[in-house]
């Protein structure tokens, strides 16, 4: 259910804004999206895992807050480019 260290470093290198950028909002969204995908796959098999379902909702809310910050700080163009790269739906338009 959690992502491996190698996968996390791949996401960081793919979404970083500059070298050694591990905490930018783009990287945070990418890592949260990967964790959400993993939990979604887990819940397809284990339908009654309500503890996991609650954790998934927490991650979705956290990603939504980070996406709101990206949209506010960087503008609609960067926000739309990020959600297109992540392959998720637009929640604001």
Swiss-Prot record:
The protein's gene is named: rpsO
Database matches in NCBIfam families: S15_bact
Q: Does the keyword tRNA processing apply?
A: no
Q: Native species of this protein?
A: Ehrlichia chaffeensis (strain ATCC CRL-10679 / Arkansas)
Keyword Transit peptide attached: no
A cellular component term, taken from the record's GO annotations:
cytosolic small ribosomal subunit
Gene3D superfamilies for this protein: 6.10.250.3130, S15/NS1, RNA-binding
Protein name from the UniProt record: Small ribosomal subunit protein uS15
Give a short account of what the protein does: One of the primary rRNA binding proteins, it binds directly to 16S rRNA where it helps nucleate assembly of the platform of the 30S subunit by binding and bridging several RNA helices of the 16S rRNA. Forms an intersubunit bridge (bridge B4) with the 23S rRNA of the 50S subunit in the ribosome.
């Amino acid at each position: 259910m959690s992502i491996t260290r190698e996968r996390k470093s791949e996401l960081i290198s793919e979404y970083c804004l500059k070298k050694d950028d591990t905490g930018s909002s783009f990287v945070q969204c990418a890592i949260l999206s990967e964790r959400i995908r993993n939990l979604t796959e887990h819940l397809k098999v284990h339908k009654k895992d309500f503890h996991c379902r609650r954790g998934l909702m927490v991650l979705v809310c956290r990603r939504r807050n980070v996406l709101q910050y990206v949209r506010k700080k960087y503008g609609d163009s960067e926000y739309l480019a990020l959600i297109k790269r992540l392959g998720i739906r637009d929640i604001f338009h």
